[in-house]
Amino acid sequence: MQRFHTAVIGAGASGLVAAISAKRAKNTIIILERLPSIGKKLLACGGGRCNFLNDKIDESYYNLSARSLVKSAFSRFGKIEILRFFEELGLHHYCEQGRIFPVTNQASSVLKVLEIEIKRLSIPIEIGFEVADIVSSREGFLVSSSANKKIICDNIILAAGGRSYPALGSDGSCYKFCRSFGHRIIEAVPSAVPIEISDKTCHFLQGQKIFVCAKSLIDGKINSETRGELLFTKYGLSGTAILDISQDLSVALNREPRLPAQVLVDFAPFLDEADLKSELSSRIKAGFEPLDLLCGILPNKFGSAFLDLLKSKDPGKITTELKHKIFKALRTRGWNEAEFTCGGVDTSQISEKSLESKLKKKLYFCGEILDVEGRRGGYNLAWAFSSGFIAGLTE
């Protein structure tokens, strides 16, 4: 049976960086990956462009419960260190509205430079290794696969991800091993995910995109707000604006106690209410047909979608509806459509300095398996790289 200093479970963004970090520290390393290839989720990041970092990065862009842990990690391996790490691997980058991308605009470039470094360091990768059991003894950790392969190691780095995009490798199957060592799992719910809505407007405007101001309403109170693109779908709402506020909605809809969740949309954020009302009043007085009242303000199809409202020829009523349209959220879409996981291993049980378990010596965590969620825009990959590098500094 082969023995290693450290076994990294999971060959995603955090696991690959953890393995490189650990190997550079002169340790014997093995990567265990259940899929037939590595980095599949990384290849899908940013629509294949891989927004791997953000120009503005600190703990304030992450969930409140994780901020202390994130702050500690970034103080040791933050934006400057992440960029230097990839530059030394040969990856060139550029910044677009604060989001950092490889100059190739290909996620495969990010994965490839990591693969080249892993090969240079002679780090073995066991693909198709689905972990079935982890047993701890005085001699170390015995890791067994579903095919009855076994390895023994002194340290384990759990980098197996959360539950989003299970077809790409992260399905939450390693949470059970975390629990077996006493760790508490914050219930995982999908995040950066489309929302299902029951509203005829969504069906009528299916496929339409529009720039809006969107807010999440949880139990009648505004929780979050963003500006961005809204996309109407056959099942409800999607687009960047919805994905950005979906964490609050998902927690309310999927965790007990389940709370009423709504989406409040301003379809004309470029006009204040008084100006919109005045514009509509002028058009009504000028004899505009109801179907044409929104021409030049909203896409043409909106006239048909809101025709009953427009027929009222009441500028105040129309303005209120367009500036404060409320959609009742029924449910989130499933894990196959979620970009991130909200939830995971409770960060209060993890050492801020080393990312080692406070409950089990020589057990480390990194990446999305932890209850750490950043905003969209490169923050989650930044966490993956930072936490992976630090977890790899095992003693």
Located regions from the model:
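A conserved short coil-to-beta-strand element within the FAD-binding core of flavoproteins
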Residues: I127-G140
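An anion/pyrophosphate-binding glycine-rich loop and adjacent beta-alpha core
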Residues: P36-I38, L43-A44, F52-L53, D58-E59, ...
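Glycine-rich active-site loop/strand segments that organize a redox cofactor
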Residues: G47-Q97
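N-terminal Rossmann-like FAD-binding beta1-loop-alpha1 element of flavoenzymes
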Residues: F4-I31, A391-E395
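Short hydrophobic core segments
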Residues: A7-I9, L32, V131, K150-A167, ...
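Glycine-rich loop(s) and the adjacent beta-strand/alpha-helix scaffold that form part
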Residues: N155-T201
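A glycine-rich dinucleotide-binding beta-alpha-beta segment and adjacent secondary-structure elements
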Residues: I127, K301-E373
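Glycine-rich FAD pyrophosphate-binding loop
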Residues: K23-G47
